[in-house]
Regions:
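Gly/Ser-rich catalytic/binding loops embedded in alpha/beta enzyme cores
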Residues: 2-175, 284, 289, 294, ...
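A short helix-breaking turn/cap at a secondary-structure junction
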Residues: 191-277, 459-469
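Short glycine/serine-rich loop segments
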Residues: 104-105, 109-230, 414-415, 419-426, ...
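Short helix-loop capping/hinge segments that flank enzyme active sites or metal/cofactor-binding pockets
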Residues: 71-94, 253-262, 311-366, 378, ...
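Acyltransferase
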Residues: 21-26, 56-59, 102, 271-297, ...
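Glycine-rich, small-residue loops and helix-cap segments
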Residues: 17, 73, 166-167, 346-470
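Short, well-ordered beta-strand elements within core beta-sheets of diverse protein domains
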Residues: 10-16, 95-99, 214-221, 341-346, ...
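Glycine/threonine-rich flexible loop motifs
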Residues: 88-98, 272-273, 385-393
Length: 470
């Protein structure tokens, strides 16, 4: 019965006492038992007895006080890198299997007030790269083809949501880690403005102006479902001095909106055949719904973006790796080792130059948003690739020069801190899904979600469910 219900419908039925929280939890636990062995999306499980006892207790509390938060009693599985007290957090890396946190992450503390934690979702090793595989938990399968990648680094979360193992999920996004797996799963994935969701943060030493380049994000099958999670976890928290509250934004009619279609950023980005066609087919249909679409030619130089981005990313990751006190760096996966070595070589002057380039493009992007409500780019440069690959090496016949060049399409939003949602755009002739990034100005997170809601009303991509999960 619950299989075809939206999050809104489930919440309404719980509040009206038409269904019990325990029934909802049992529904999702049954689906996890049935489908998760094929997917490997949820990789760490809270004891089922504890979960069912908590569900019963929440039902009892609801009966005595029904003024509860919307996500009260709903199941959630956090990305493996978030700490749950007394549960392993290892980032998919064997050396850290004995890392047992003594306290919860801010996000987990927030969940525990209302939701029911059922486990953790899989990730790329150290959350580096757009392919969810690691040497502790293995690879997560794509919900539309189990031989393909689920994307990453939050691929476990996206696969779990797409398979309806959980109603929605968090992820993190530095370089596409919510947008990429959402595109690979035919769902919606949000990279908010960094700071919109409070986090446990560390500061880069001696670099107070170092920008926020990573953020917690969200996944859901529909934007409306996503709003319930995002509205709960967003907002200022006194424990995170960089967090802030978002302002509400009035909805605009589609006919009043204008999108700048960046395509390949002045022929600078490479895409697997078929990706541009899917995006442009959707854009034509949006035009027929009176949305204004313009092909965009800009002064943005992708190589400058790339230079700035890989400096800031590698420096951030290098400083992060130092926190783990790893004994054998040669055991790092190749992608993480690349970042460690790159970060180790970066000087303060390199970072300052990268920040200078970033600031230059912040000014340019503000000028663009005077003319456009949104910018648009494909959500990936490749369709879901073989799961047994360590890393893609080609885009069509073009050799990739670093492990992450196939992720370059994410750098515009990531470098400039722009809220971005990946929306589904359809499937190729092999039945593999793809998405498109809708990018708004800083702190206009609600604007991209509002647009995505209108978009889903037109196209109803959530009706396409993976046959392998039925």
């Amino acid at each position: 019965m619950l299989e075809n219900f939206s999050v809104h419908q489930i919440i309404s039925k719980i509040k009206d006492r038409e269904i019990k929280i325990a029934e909802v939890i049992n529904f999702y636990l049954d689906r996890i038992k049935k489908f998760n062995p094929k997917l490997n999306a949820i990789i760490s499980h809270i004891d089922e007895t504890k979960i069912t006892e908590e569900a019963k207790l929440k039902d009892e509390n609801f009966n005595s006080d029904n003024d509860k938060d919307d996500i009260y009693g709903l199941p959630i599985a956090v990305k493996e890198l978030f700490d749950i007290k007394n549960e392993v957090t290892c980032y998919g890396y064997k050396e850290l299997l004995k890392n047992i946190p003594k306290q919860n992450s801010l996000l987990v503390d927030n969940y525990k007030k209302n939701a029911i934690l059922i486990g953790k979702t899989n990730l790329s090793e150290f959350a580096v790269g757009c392919h969810t595989t690691n040497r502790v938990y293995g690879a997560t399968s794509n919900v539309y083809d189990h031989s393909k990648s689920a994307g990453g680094s939050s691929g476990g979360a996206a696969a779990a949501v797409a398979a309806n193992l959980i109603p929605f999920a968090d992820g993190t996004d530095m370089m596409g880690s919510c947008r990429n797996p959402a595109a690979f799963a035919n769902i919606y994935g949000l990279r908010p403005t960094p700071g919109a969701i409070a986090e446990d943060r560390f500061e880069i030493k001696n670099l107070k102006d170092f920008p926020l380049i990573s953020t917690t994000g969200c996944f859901a099958r529909t934007p409306n479902d996503m709003e319930f999670l995002f509205n709960y976890i967003k907002g200022r928290n006194v424990k995170d001095k960089l967090s802030f509250d978002l302002k509400d934004i009035n909805n605009k009619k589609l006919s009043d909106l204008k999108i700048g279609w960046c395509i390949d950023l002045n022929e600078q980005y490479k895409y697997e055949d078929g990706i541009i066609d899917l995006c442009e087919n959707i854009l034509k249909k949006l035009q027929s719904n009176n949305l204004n679409i313009e092909d965009l030619k800009t002064e943005i130089n992708s190589e400058e973006l790339w230079y700035s981005w890989i400096i800031l990313r590698a420096k951030f990751l290098y400083e992060n790796f130092l926190l783990y006190n790893l004994k054998n760096l040669n055991e790092l996966p190749s992608q993480a080792y690349w970042e460690y070595e790159k970060g180790k070589s970066i000087k303060t002057k390199d970072v300052l130059k990268a920040i200078e380039i970033r600031n230059k493009y912040m000014d340019k992007i503000q000028n663009l948003f005077k003319h456009y409500d949104f910018l648009a780019l494909p959500s990936a440069q490749l369709f879901p690739f073989e799961k047994n690959l360590n890393n893609p090496e080609f885009i069509n016949d073009n050799k990739i020069d670093t492990y992450h060049r196939y992720m370059e399409v994410y750098t515009l939003s990531s470098l400039l801190g722009l809220p971005t949602i990946s929306i589904p755009v359809g499937f190729n002739n092999k039945g593999l899904p793809m998405g498109m990034q809708i990018i708004a100005n800083v702190k206009e997170d609600n604007k991209v979600i509002n647009f995505a809601n209108s978009y889903e009303e037109i196209f109803n991509f959530s009706k396409f469910k993976p046959k392998l999960m039925q």
